[in-house]
Amino acid sequence: HGGIMSDRYMREVLLPNVRTGLQRAGRDWSDIEISESGYLVIGDDDSEIEQKLLGMRRALSFYGSTRTYHEVLRTHGLEELGQKLHALSLQGKWEEMRDTVTLDDLNELAQTCTYDELPQFLGEHREYASRSGFGMPRGTPAEEERFQDLLAKVQAVETSGVPKGLEL
């Protein structure tokens, strides 16, 4: 699934609307499942994280050109970026679109952590999530072992399933 989703938009717009729907239906957070959401960029160190952020430029420029996602950009003060990307898309300037997205834009929309920080990050910042997913290199036996170790730690993270401040 592609698109633009940020933790801020999730917390300020989406989850409050889900809460309203739950209240109207007489249901509770435990009646639904929410997958971990928002751009989360994970790497071994700041350099790898920055490279992965920069690798998101093409996708963000494409989705950001689509007016459907301008509300997410607006939440972050990036509405002008969305308008510029849309105009460039109408002109077929795909490379220029990618180059329009800056590292500052990416840092505004994404959250980052290292692989070692991931379990703590999920517990502190994705407390609403019933499910989480992540990717990392698994091409060698050592990488696979590291992945399995991190996977066990992530699976051990207990979350409330209730967004902070949106209890029913």
Feature map (PLM): residue ranges:
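Active-site-adjacent structural elements that line small-molecule/cofactor binding pockets in enzymes
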Residues: H1-L168
